[in-house]
Amino acid sequence: MAIKKSIRLECGECKEINYLTFKNAKKHPEKLELNKYCKRCRSAKPHKETKKK
């Protein structure tokens, strides 16, 4: 059974947490980085994975 890890995606520029998602930590152990829309910056910026507390 796959172990899903809850993660937050944080804007690389303004450091605001905009997205919550899950990932399979066993298949993808590396940190996730996606180009997503940031409400505060009002443009698409790279969002990096942070741990959910």
Swiss-Prot record:
GO BP, sorted A to Z: translation
Keyword Ion transport carried by entry: no
Domain of life: Bacteria
Cited InterPro entries: Ribosomal_bL33, Ribosomal_bL33_CS, Ribosomal_bL33_sf, Ribosomal_zn-bd
GO MF annotations in UniProt: structural constituent of ribosome
Keywords: Ribonucleoprotein, Ribosomal protein
GO cellular component terms, A-Z: cytoplasm; ribonucleoprotein complex; ribosome
Family from the record: Belongs to the bacterial ribosomal protein bL33 family.
UniProt name for this protein: Large ribosomal subunit protein bL33
Lineage: Bacteria, Bacillati, Mycoplasmatota, Mycoplasmoidales, Mycoplasmoidaceae
Gene: rpmG
